[in-house]
Amino acid sequence: METPAQLLFLLLLWLPDTTGEIVLTQSPGTLSLSPGERATLSCRASQSVSSSYLAWYQQKPGQAPRLLIYGASSRATGIPDRFSGSGSGTDFTLTISRLEPEDFAVYYCQQYGSSP
């Protein structure tokens, strides 16, 4: 029987803005899933951010973060189509449709650039 592996993702970043800090909170903190299952990761901003400036990253131990999604829903070059991003305003989601063994990692969302 296969033991579920852990999929982790965390709060990443706050950026100063003219109206104060934008705080991004991710949930849940840990997912226990097996290869082939679907993963849904949520990122909530403390105030509305432009979808144009929301990114998702994957990081594995000892490696630099890898850009997965930019502009909330656009896949970076070379990213498999099992990764998809969606959302707007304050609520954003990263979905991995069918987990592969190499997908077990830490995931971050980031607000970058400007916000309206």
Curated annotation (Swiss-Prot):
Cystine bridges: C43-C109
Region feature (Complementarity-determining-3): 110-116
Gene Ontology CC: blood microparticle; extracellular exosome; extracellular region; extracellular space; immunoglobulin complex; monomeric IgA immunoglobulin complex; pentameric IgM immunoglobulin complex; plasma membrane
InterPro entries assigned to the protein according to its UniProt record, in alphabetical order: Ig-like_dom, Ig-like_dom_sf, Ig-like_fold, Ig_sub, Ig_V-set, IgV_Light_Chain
BP-aspect Gene Ontology terms: adaptive immune response; antibacterial humoral response; glomerular filtration; immune response
Span list, region Framework-1: 21-43
Protein name: Immunoglobulin kappa variable 3-20
Source organism of this protein record: Homo sapiens (Human)
Gene this chain is encoded by: IGKV3-20
